[in-house]
From Swiss-Prot:
This is Porphobilinogen deaminase. Binds 1 dipyrromethane group covalently. It comes from Brucella abortus (strain 2308). GO terms for cellular component: cytoplasm. Its cofactor is dipyrromethane. It is an enzyme of class 2 (transferase). Coiled coil: none annotated. Pathway: Porphyrin-containing compound metabolism; protoporphyrin-IX biosynthesis; coproporphyrinogen-III from 5-aminolevulinate: step 2/4. The modification S-(dipyrrolylmethanemethyl)cysteine is found at residue 249. SUPFAM superfamilies: Periplasmic binding protein-like II, Porphobilinogen deaminase (hydroxymethylbilane synthase), C-terminal domain. Tetrapolymerization of the monopyrrole PBG into the hydroxymethylbilane pre-uroporphyrinogen in several discrete steps. The porphobilinogen subunits are added to the dipyrromethane group. Signal peptide: none annotated.
Length: 314
């Protein structure tokens, strides 16, 4: 594991090359500049192509899961070619490479899912037999649970690609994260925002996570002002829930934690891909127990589902 290149005068941020990923990297750079009074040229953004960006014709669940979006970037971090990596936390596996950690989470944007409809503005108002595009197993399962009459088709690509396919009439509607659309200045395309009590989001959705090398004290000091307390606590719970269930792109898992003062509330769900079976769990407690609450919720929902719930489709 290499030492930080920032000692040579420039902090290097690694990111995917999509518009959304770059918007998140630029936000991180701006926050670092404001926190430390740094000039713009003190921080360099290095876009990288990942396997997940290159493979667009198959679901992630078939070709390696979430790690496809991070492997090349994390290798650059380990090698010292970059100092930090900026990620959408919902795309991050819970098990990270040795020597790396998600050290800071920025203040969370809206964690909810957005529906963008062509033949109806609201998801529940879609006509019977309508076609909805989504590549997320969680969203697919929730769609099938709520509207089993709707056809769900695999729908990959970046935000622009998905919206272009929608405009071309390939589907009647699609789902995207509210946070991503807002960060891209595209909130006006949203026709319906899904109630998280009915359509719960992915763990970590709406939060930007910054990955760094464990023990890199200079980077830790630089990042510390960017850490958002409530987001850090909520994600400790959500990612513990996900990790205890061995969550990946092959498992429809939802979870959202909210923080009020020193109290935390959590609601999680696991589903079968066809949406026919779903099990929900809730938890409440003090924020200092966030990770333990998430792990306990995972153990309880697994017990509810029974030992064979994940058999045959994980």
């Amino acid at each position: 594991m290499q030492t930080a290149s920032f000692k040579n005068g420039t902090l290097k941020i690694g990111t995917r090359g999509s518009k959304l990923a770059l918007a998140q990297a630029y936000l991180t750079r701006r926050l670092l500049q404001e926190a430390h009074g740094l000039p713009e040229d003190a921080i360099e953004i290095l876009p990288m192509s990942t396997a997940g960006d290159r493979i667009q014709d198959r679901p992630l669940s078939e070709v390696g899961g979430k790690g496809l979006f991070t492997e090349e970037i994390e290798q650059a971090l380990k090698d010292g070619r970059i100092d930090i990596a900026v990620h959408s936390t919902k795309d991050m596996p819970t098990a990270l490479p040795e020597g790396l950690h998600l050290s800071v989470f920025l203040e969370r944007e809206d964690p909810r899912d957005a529906f963008i409809g062509r033949s109806a503005r609201r998801f529940m108002d879609l006509p019977q037999g309508a076609t909805v595009g989504s590549s997320s197993l969680r969203r697919q399962a929730l769609i099938r649970r709520l509207r089993p009459d709707i056809e769900v088709v695999m729908y990959r690509g970046n935000v622009d690609t998905r919206l272009r396919k929608l405009d071309a009439g390939e589907v009647d509607g699609t789902f995207l994260a509210c946070a991503g659309l807002r960060r891209l200045g595209l909130a006006d395309v949203i026709t319906d925002v899904l109630d998280p009590s009915v359509f719960p989001p992915a763990p970590g959705q709406g939060a930007i996570g910054i990955e760094s090398r464990i023990g890199d004290e200079r980077i830790d000091v630089l990042l510390a002002p960017l850490a958002h307390r409530e987001t850090q606590i909520a994600l400790a719970c959500e990612r513990a829930f996900l990790g205890a269930l061995d969550g990946s792109c092959r498992t429809p898992i939802a979870g959202l934690a909210t923080v009020e003062g020193d109290r935390l509330s959590f609601r999680g769900m696991i589903l079968t891909p066809d949406g026919r079976q779903a099990h929900e769990v809730t938890a409440e407690g003090v924020v200092s127990d966030a990770a333990a609450l998430g792990t306990d919720a995972a153990n309880r929902v697994r017990a509810m589902a029974g030992p064979h719930f994940f058999d045959g489709w994980q």
